[in-house]
Regions:
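Bacterial N-terminal signal peptides that target proteins for export
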Residues: 1-10
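Bacterial N-terminal signal peptides
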Residues: 9-18
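Sec/Tat signal peptide C-region and signal peptidase I cleavage site
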Residues: 18-24
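Extracytoplasmic small-molecule ligand-binding "clamshell" domains
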Residues: 24-102
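Extended ligand-binding regions for polar small-molecule ligands
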Residues: 25, 63-72, 135-138, 142, ...
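Short beta-strand->loop
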Residues: 41, 57-59, 146-154, 177
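Ligand-binding cleft/hinge of the Venus flytrap
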Residues: 51-54, 66-77, 119, 157-176, ...
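Acidic, polar ligand-binding/catalytic clefts
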Residues: 66, 70, 74, 78-143, ...
């Protein structure tokens, strides 16, 4: 099957799913009546969700929601974006504040099975790493014994960090922040020795620093982070639409 035929088949599949779901899916009915999709995204992460000087959103996670809007309405602009911190994101979805969460969120068994959520697929496969100032003189994460570590609250990153230091018999002092920009600024200001996050976030945050060349991502990758969109559990019709889009 050539690319054009495959694309046509996928579009047809999605449109059929939308049509058949119109009678059953509560989320879809509410979205159609409202006239737009409510999409939760990150609060400023280049490559995933970021706004330009005119306030226009761009990035992988943004494109996912625009594609879903195109599938439902035939118009990719029928979407409103809500920037959320890591601590806010799951609650916003569970409470119905948003219809879909497309915010570099790790697919874990506990989130998928015990928190009333359904992950629709993987859009980016990541791994957790460490960003340090070169003047610290560190070449490996295994040299970070006794370090102060900036980490974003409400993330799997916190748990992975604890596991890694314990497994390597090292001590550390965590300093938590609600927003990724806050943790990066703390590293830049010298309030912590190292910043830990998904590697994609580390590279994105490094670009935004005043002197990005002064910082380096260490070679260790300490976790596997499959990132993808999330919807509420219990509405299979809406889940299928987001998944197949």
């Amino acid at each position: 099957m050539n690319g054009r035929a495959l694309s046509a088949t996928l579009v047809t599949t999605v449109l059929l799913a939308v049509a058949s779901s119109a009678h059953a899916g509560t989320a879809l009915n509410a979205i159609k009546e409202r006239g737009h999709i409510k999409c939760g995204v990150s609060d400023g992460l280049p490559g995933f969700s970021h706004t330009d000087e005119k306030g226009k959103f761009s990035g992988i996670d943004v494109d996912v929601c625009r594609a879903v809007a195109a599938a439902v309405f035939g118009d990719s602009t029928k979407v409103k974006f809500t920037p959320l911190t890591a601590k806010e994101r799951l609650t916003a979805l569970q409470s119905g504040e948003i219809d879909v969460l497309s915010r570099n969120t790790t697919w874990t068994s506990s989130r998928d099975s015990a928190q009333g959520l359904n992950f629709t697929g993987v859009t980016y496969y990541d791994g957790q790493g460490f960003l340090v100032n070169k003047k610290l003189g560190v070449k490996s994460a295994k040299e970070l014994d006794g370090a102060t570590v900036c980490v974003q609250a409400g993330t799997t990153t916190e748990l992975n960090l604890s596991d890694y230091f314990r497994a390597n018999k090292m001590k550390y002092t965590p300093i938590t922040y609600d927003k990724s920009d806050e943790s990066a600024k703390a590293l830049e200001a010298g309030r912590c020795d190292v910043l830990t996050s998904d590697q994609s976030q580390l590279y994105a945050q490094r670009i935004k620093l005043a002197k990005p060349g002064d910082y380096v991502v260490l070679p260790e990758v300490i976790s596997k982070e499959p990132l993808g969109p999330v919807v509420r559990h219990g509405d299979d019709d809406w889940f299928d639409i987001v998944k197949w889009t």
